[in-house]
């Protein structure tokens, strides 16, 4: 779904303050264990400006639920006040409880919401993939860039898809906001 050459790496991003930004979290809660390869918790910060998506930051860790919660809280403090924070709401009561816990106890005072996913991971990644192919995704060059691109190129057959999931969630959320602002006239 992705090719390495589709990613445009940039050292600086234009007008970050003017961007609509979403930090989307894909949760996991398993600490790193020798001999195992558990999923990562990933928080992808994506901006949108003038028809282009900018991958501005990736927070990625393997940790206990307490370590994950602390990273999410610290990242919210680090991000701009206008960043919308989203998190995938897993099905069932546990998903509802997780979102409620974060809304009341961890991210109170921030723009936060849970997002129910629908469709397969590949379906949810289509907008991200298409935008990359068209040259409409810019990636800030950073220590996390190589791991991100490697994971994308291996998707959906790679051992991990957490960064793809988080970025897809952010891009889909930003796309939903853009669609709300468009006015359609039917003749």
Language model: regions and residue ranges:
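Structural motif
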Residues: 34-35, 121, 157-163
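Mg2+-dependent endonuclease catalytic cores in nucleic-acid-processing enzymes, primarily RNase H-like
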Residues: 42-44, 49-155
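Short, flexible loop/turn motifs enriched in small residues
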Residues: 34-42
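Acidic two-metal-ion nuclease catalytic site recognized across multiple nuclease folds
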Residues: 3, 9-10, 170-187
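ATPase catalytic-site recognition across NTP-hydrolyzing enzymes
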Residues: 1-32
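Active-site-proximal flexible loops/turns
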Residues: 33, 95, 169-172
């Amino acid at each position: 779904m992705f090719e390495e050459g589709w990613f445009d790496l940039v050292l600086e991003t234009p007008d970050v303050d003017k961007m609509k930004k979403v930090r989307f979290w894909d949760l996991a809660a398993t600490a790193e264990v020798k001999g195992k390869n558990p999923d990562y918790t990933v928080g992808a910060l994506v901006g949108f400006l003038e028809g282009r998506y900018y991958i501005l930051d990736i927070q990625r860790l393997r940790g206990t639920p307490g370590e994950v919660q602390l990273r999410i809280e610290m990242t919210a403090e680090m991000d701009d006040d206008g960043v919308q924070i989203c998190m995938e709401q897993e099905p069932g009561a546990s998903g509802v409880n997780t979102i409620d816990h974060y809304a009341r106890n961890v991210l109170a005072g921030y723009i936060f919401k849970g997002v129910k996913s629908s469709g397969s991971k590949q379906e949810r990644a289509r907008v991200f993939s298409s935008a990359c192919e068209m040259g409409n995704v810019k990636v800030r060059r950073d220590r996390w860039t190589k791991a991100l691109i490697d994971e994308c190129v291996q998707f959906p057959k790679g051992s991990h898809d957490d960064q793809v999931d988080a970025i897809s969630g952010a891009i889909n959320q930003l796309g939903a906001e853009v669609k709300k602002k468009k006015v359609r006239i039917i003749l």
